[in-house]
Swiss-Prot record:
HAMAP family: MurD. This is UDP-N-acetylmuramoylalanine--D-glutamate ligase. Keywords: ATP-binding, Cell cycle, Cell division, Cell shape, Cell wall biogenesis/degradation, Cytoplasm, Ligase, Nucleotide-binding, Peptidoglycan synthesis. Pathway: Cell wall biogenesis; peptidoglycan biosynthesis.
């Protein structure tokens, strides 16, 4: 447990996470100062009066006078104000670092470009099925500091690359990088390896590293070692097995579950299940209750979620596909009897869209591209692409064309912030329009 008495603490970024940091320090007798580049950040009205605040910009004077800066994952460490503070020897951490210094129970830590919320939630469900008092949060749901509790027997944290950059005290009982594909390239000017390096921090001091046998970028820099357990489609300690038209989850050659008993579908979800099982095993959860959780878990909203099945047409909301890798996961092995009407678009965060091209061949694909990067996406296969300003226009365009056996899939490969508040709002809008138009 760290001692912050007498420290001059500055918190950058409000919102739920910033408020959890404020509460953390106030409970320890330290009154921090808070700043946010937004004029009226969320949570400003909930800030106790005693806490000094500065909004609309960063206050360099406060930063340079600090003993400790707690930075929101939303601000890049490369920001000139933070660079100057780091050069002056001022410690910069994030809320996850504060959490790791205090947590008394084992931590399962999960990162990756895609699938991390599903796997985090699944491991949490596995713990609950075993009767374990578990705290689930981090980059999903509740901020980590709100989970700190003497009664907690296990923590399961989803961590973003941004959170890992400011974390050095994590000692996970089990840690995984599910996959590494281009995302947030606007924050990583040196490209994919810089982004990967941030993710790799999760393995430091981990007891077990769960790696993806199909993705070399998830391996520790020095290669797999005795701490590593692997999962994969056809290879790995935890893998899929296809026999007589059925698919099984297997562990070291032993069949443990037929996927038809799972509520989740799609190959990417079966590998998510394998990763969750590997983490749960490493954390010492009983296998039987973990498998039971796999048969009852229905998945998360906005993640390949069937929002309407009507007149033989399936409308699927995969709004959480905010990067290319996530849309690839949705399209890989996807079977559609009729035509796939694919909605793509939004803010591509400087990503390369070309890996999607191989999934867009064939006569039964139609593209509807919208938002900031709609033009670029339509260029993937112009002869079957239509371009509109908004998602709603695209949906009104495609609705009269759908036939029984078709699928309408929103898997945009882009962030939503050019036209929506977040991916949830985009997904809810899709669901609303699907019910109106379908």
């Amino acid at each position: 447990m760290a001692d912050y008495q007498g420290k001059n603490v500055v918190i950058i970024g409000l919102g739920l996470t910033g408020l959890s940091c404020v509460d953390f320090f106030l409970a320890r007798g330290v009154t921090p100062r808070v700043m946010d580049t937004r004029m009226t950040p969320p949570g400003l009205d909930k800030l106790p009066e005693a806490v000094e605040r500065h909004t609309g910009s960063l206050n360099d004077e406060w930063l340079m006078a600090a003993d400790l800066i707690v930075a929101s994952p939303g601000i890049a460490l490369a920001h000139p104000s933070l660079s100057a503070a780091a050069d002056a020897g001022i410690e910069i951490v994030g809320d996850i670092e504060l959490f790791c210094r205090e947590a008394q129970a084992p931590i399962v830590a999960i990162t990756g470009s895609n699938g991390k919320s599903t796997v985090t939630t699944l491991v949490g469900e596995m713990a609950k099925a075993a009767g374990v008092n578990v705290g689930v949060g981090g980059n999903i749901g509740l901020p980590a500091l709100m989970l700190l509790d003497d009664e907690c027997e296990l923590y399961v944290l989803e961590l973003s690359s941004f959170q890992l950059e400011t974390t050095s005290s994590l000692q996970a009982v089990a840690a995984t990088i599910l996959n590494v594909t281009e995302d947030h390239m606007d924050r990583y000017p040196f490209g994919l390896q810089q982004y990967r390096a941030a993710k790799l921090r999760i393995y430091e001091n981990a007891k077990v590293c769960v790696v993806n046998a199909d993705d070399a970028l998830t391996m520790p820099i020095r290669g797999a070692d005795e701490r590593c357990v692997s999962f994969g489609v056809n290879m790995g300690d935890y893998h899929l097995n296809h026999q007589q038209g059925e698919t099984w989850l297997r562990v070291k050659g032993e069949k443990v579950l037929n996927v038809k008993e799972m509520k989740l579908s799609g190959q990417h979800n079966y590998t998510n299940a394998l990763a969750a099982l590997a983490l749960a095993d490493a954390a010492g959860l009983p296998r039987a209750s973990s498998l039971k959780a796999l048969t009852t878990f229905t998945g998360l909203p906005h993640r390949f979620e069937v929002v309407l099945e009507h007149n033989g047409v399936r409308w699927i909301n995969d709004s959480k596909a905010t990067n290319v890798g996530s849309t690839e996961a949705a399209l890989n092995g996807l079977h559609v009897d009729g035509t796939l009407h694919l909605l793509l678009g939004g803010d591509g965060k400087s990503a390369d869209f070309s890996p999607l091209a191989r999934y867009l061949n064939g006569d039964n694909v139609r593209l509807y591209c919208f938002g900031r990067d709609g033009v670029q996406l339509a260029a993937l296969r112009p002869e079957v692409a239509e371009q509109t300003e908004t998602m709603e226009q695209a949906m009104r365009l495609l609705a009269p064309r759908v036939q029984p056996g078709d699928m309408v899939l929103l898997s945009p490969a882009c962030a939503s912030l050019d036209q929506f508040k977040n991916f949830e709002q985009r997904g809810n809008e899709f669901a609303r329009l699907a019910k109106e138009l379908g």
